[in-house]
Amino acid sequence: MNRPIKFRACYLPTLKMFDMEDLIHEEHLLDMLTMVNGKSKEDFSPLMQFTGFYDRNGKEIFEDDIVEIRNHPFDRFIGIDGMYRVGYSDRMEICCGSWLLHHVLPYATVVGNMYQHPHLLGGTEDE
């Protein structure tokens, strides 16, 4: 799969999302182990990479996004509809929950991410 390489990170104190251009200064990647634009590395989420996939509305899907699966034709048989975190399986396949993401794309909508919207996965706003 040929896809653009994109990353983003969430600044946790304000929950503001920064894309890679925001994290690069004067054409050099800033030392992520110390400071980013005067902010401590510990204040940022881990980097989230673009999966190369888009949801049913054309929105980019990144690692740690939360997608909602709705109206999947198999839902009445095996219960697919619901909210899932996007990530990699043990076999390095891009999944949402235990479902392969590319199999459910026509039914997937990005509704948030696990840093700004943990409540969508049953967590709390404070996590």
Place the predicted regions along the sequence by residue.
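Secondary-structure transition motif
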Residues: 1-127
